[in-house]
């Protein structure tokens, strides 16, 4: 099992022109912790995650991964840090012309030019761990379900053994049963890898299923940061209305 990284973000501000998206945001993720950034669309969740993933520069503030400052980092140092990070984006981004196993092993197979037989064996083992049927190994993405595509994308993410996994709306567009399958797969992945996970979602049920901690973001400001189930004790009226609208049944969720 690999060790997860520590993430520290302090006083983040992000502006696009005159519009400020993040307002002096500070948060952290401890090694191996699963932190969920929860909020409606347009609240700044994706901006926060992209700054942590070095896909977007912050206007002001500091971000450290394992005590290394990544704001203003050199390109060489950036490449080294990026090796620690795995991304699972909202849309799987699988290559339609490649099989399931080729998608999973894309980097090692087509960039590193490693032995195809060994790569296929690694893919088979990972598929088994993530509940991807063996008979799907030669299928193209268009021949499998949306939920299965998410699992294939997750397999592609973790095959490089990242110590920080960033997940962008991993259950968006999936029915409730498949959402639960994906959330269980995410939890098993964290247990197996020990990776730190930072997830953004607007789905409170998913946040409670996969998060140790929940951060609620509203218009670029953090209005809640605490243990996942403590959100039910929050006094903020926006959070109360968010919980009511989500129609959460606590009895069906992990405790």
Regions found by a protein language model. Give the residues of each.
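Catalytic Walker B motif of ABC-type/P-loop ATPase nucleotide-binding domains
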Residues: 165-168
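Conserved ABC ATPase "signature" region
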Residues: 117-135
């Amino acid at each position: 099992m690999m060790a997860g990284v520590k993430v520290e973000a302090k006083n983040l501000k992000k502006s696009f022109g005159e519009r400020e998206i993040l307002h002096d945001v500070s948060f952290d993720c401890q090694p191996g912790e699963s932190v969920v950034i929860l909020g409606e669309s347009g609240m700044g969740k994706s901006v926060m995650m992209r700054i942590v993933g070095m896909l977007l520069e912050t206007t002001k503030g500091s971000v450290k991964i394992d005590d290394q400052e990544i704001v203003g980092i050199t390109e060489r140092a950036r490449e080294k840090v990026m090796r620690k990070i795995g991304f699972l984006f909202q849309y799987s981004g699988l290559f339609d012309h490649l099989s399931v196993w080729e998608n999973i092993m894309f980097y090692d197979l087509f960039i590193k030019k490693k032995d195809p037989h060994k790569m296929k064996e690694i893919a088979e083992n990972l598929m088994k761990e993530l509940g991807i049927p063996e008979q799907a190994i030669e299928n193209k993405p268009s021949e499998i379900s949306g939920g299965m595509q998410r699992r294939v994308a997750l397999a592609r993410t973790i095959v490089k053994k990242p110590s920080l996994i960033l997940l962008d709306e991993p259950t968006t567009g999936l029915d409730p049963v498949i959402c639960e399958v994906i959330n269980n797969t995410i939890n098993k992945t964290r247990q197996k890898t020990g990776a730190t996970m930072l997830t953004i979602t607007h789905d409170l049920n998913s946040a409670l299923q996969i998060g140790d901690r929940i951060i609620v973001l509203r218009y670029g400001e953090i209005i809640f940061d605490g243990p996942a189930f403590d959100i039910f004790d929050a006094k903020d009226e926006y959070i109360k209305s968010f919980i009511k609208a989500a129609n959460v049944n606590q009895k069906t969720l992990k405790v």
